[in-house]
Amino acid sequence: MNKKIIFLIIALTVTFSNKGLSFERGVCAHFDSYSEDPVVYLKALKQIGASSIRVDYQWNKIERTKGKYVVSRPLVKTDAAINQSSLYGLNNLLILDYGNSLYDNGGYPTTRDGINAFANYTKWVVKKNKGKIKYYEVWNEWKNGTGMPPAMKNTGTAKGYFEIVKRVSHIIKENDPNAIILAGSFNPLTDSDNAWFYELIELGILDYIDGISIHPYSYKNENIQLRTAEANLNAIDQFYDKLTNIANRKTAIYITEIGIPNYDGIGGVNEIESSIFRKKYIKLASERSYIKGVWWYDLKDDGTNKSFNEHNFGIFKANMTLKKNTDENLSLKN
């Protein structure tokens, strides 16, 4: 074989291998709630050194009439961001999530009709976006009831979640074999969340996913030490060791949400402190071979009320001004 061809094959192998093994420095974003064109935010993400974006692609914004699938107005900007992200060196993590008022009264899809409908929505999304999505995360915080009607927040069971993951896993692999499937989105620093996921392991969830997604928020934790980057990740190490023993296998971990707000309430910190925490957390996480990425929550503040935590998680302020950073902590880059 020609030496040049051999060299090219080796070079391509190394390139794609590195891409597959690279540690993601991601950011959660809500493009459809932002005032500007998605390009403004994609450029900002590139500026701070992000390698991935994590976005919702809600079922109820795709299927508004039974059996008909359309990117409705509330998802237009998110869809545009997905289509343009590669121009800014960003991999897409897409969340398949939340209920639909057309099925199961808008609650968790647990009936046969609801599960079939969620599966059909998944198939449409995956076929439409084939080759554009590196990661699919099945639901967001099922156990917590995030995004669900208040009356249904505590009705999601481990068995119900398992059935959804099992069903859509086959659909994703059939229609986009290269996509990485993630599931979980729970907090491994809480006993109840861990018990819930251990039940999922017993049900066999690891046979249907490529990685476990976790949301190890700790800024409000009663154990003050766990609010530090070092202790947070040490606790995740302990969780991973127990997980590996229970499952009798090693499974990749993806931290698809972690953040700390600049607000006046419990666990809130100033902008410099959050920047230092973020820098340290990402660095320490990247040094653990079993952790494949961190997605910071989130890109920009959702509001300006300093008493409300949910308004103050952004790397940028609500007006897209970069928050205060020490020089060495300007971005997500290490």
Predicted regions and their residues:
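Boundary at the C-terminal end of the N-terminal hydrophobic targeting segment
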Residues: 20-22
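Hydrophobic faces of well-ordered beta-strands that scaffold small-molecule active sites
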Residues: 25-29, 51-55, 90-96, 134-138, ...
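Catalytic domains of carbohydrate-active enzymes, especially glycoside hydrolases
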Residues: 37-61, 84, 88-93
